[in-house]
């Protein structure tokens, strides 16, 4: 089994189907006795240019360890799923389990925002 990193860009207008789609791919990976080392939901993000008349996409990142047969099956499924705007499959030498910089920055921004709100609330209470 080899290590892969997969980035999926899914049509954000299919909100209800997004997690059903992801669950299908998780089942497929487990059916081939694969391992999901990291799964991240990056949420909706703006695209640099329109793709299939869309300006945003819902992004997901997966680091998995699977057989080449499973990757072929996943890639075939990605190609024929009309809800998937784009996909990238990269071969990796080892499993990546750390939080990605994109998600890390998102969490740090939330913490900064929360601390700012707390400071503002404290200042309002003092007055």
Curated annotation (Swiss-Prot):
Keywords: Ribonucleoprotein, Ribosomal protein, RNA-binding, rRNA-binding. The keyword DNA damage does not apply. CDD domains: bS6. InterPro entries: Ribosomal_bS6, Ribosomal_bS6_sf, Ribosomal_S6_plastid/chlpt, Transl_elong_EF1B/ribsomal_bS6. One of its GO terms (biological process) is translation. PANTHER family: MITOCHONDRIAL 28S RIBOSOMAL PROTEIN S6, SMALL RIBOSOMAL SUBUNIT PROTEIN BS6M. Binds together with bS18 to 16S ribosomal RNA. This is Small ribosomal subunit protein bS6.
């Amino acid at each position: 089994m080899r290590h892969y990193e997969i980035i999926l860009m899914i049509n954000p207008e299919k909100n209800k189907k997004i997690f059903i789609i992801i669950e299908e791919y998780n089942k497929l990976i487990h059916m081939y006795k694969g391992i999901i080392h990291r799964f991240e939901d990056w949420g909706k993000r703006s695209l640099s240019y329109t793709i299939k008349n869309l300006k945003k996409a819902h992004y997901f990142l997966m680091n998995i360890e699977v057989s080449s047969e499973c990757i072929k099956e996943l890639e075939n499924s990605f190609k024929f799923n009309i809800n998937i705007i784009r996909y990238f499959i990269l071969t990796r030498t080892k499993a990546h389990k750390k939080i990605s910089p994109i998600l890390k920055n998102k969490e740090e921004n939330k913490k900064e925002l929360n601390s700012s709100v707390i400071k503002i609330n404290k200042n309002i209470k003092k007055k």
